[in-house]
Amino acid sequence: MNAKVESLREVFENEEQSIIHGDLHTGSFMVNNDQVKVIDPEFACWGPIGFDLGCLLANLIIDYLFHLTNNEEYCLFIIKIIYNILSTFEKDLSEKIPKNYKTIMIDSAAYAGTEIIRRTIGIALAKEVSIMDEKGNNIAFRKNLLIIGIDLITNSEKYGSCENFIKRIKKLHVN
């Protein structure tokens, strides 16, 4: 896993594929009936295309796992959001940059894993992790997040398509 994370760091530092937001999550969007705006670009920089997608997916996966035992309808909504994001991204990438899109999708999964781990044990904890800490249920929740984060990193190639990503996420469970 260390080699994979080092590889992701190298890509982040050296692959200037696009201007990226650098901190993309569900709170980065303002939406109304007519438009979507992305806000808070203070971490924007040149970087790998898969980084922002990975950060957004991590945020959604953490939320999904947080609600998995008590809100099935909301979890289905999260799966639909992940599906819509990934299927649109996959379609657009495969048309516009066909020889690189698979790598970008795989990198997105791996970056999602690193972001889940960072938001689980780092300084900037996910709100869901803090809530579980307050409830005293943090050990199992954090363990599950770390397992998922590690799987996204070490098995990122298995998440390399929208269909495979959704299948693997639907298999998540809470111990």
Segments (PLM) and residue ranges:
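Active-site activation/catalytic loop segments of kinase-like enzymes and analogous catalytic loops
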Residues: 50-96, 112-130
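Surface-exposed helix-capping loop/turn segments at secondary-structure junctions
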Residues: 91-100, 157-160
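Catalytic activation segment of kinase domains across protein kinase-like and atypical kinase folds
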Residues: 26-67
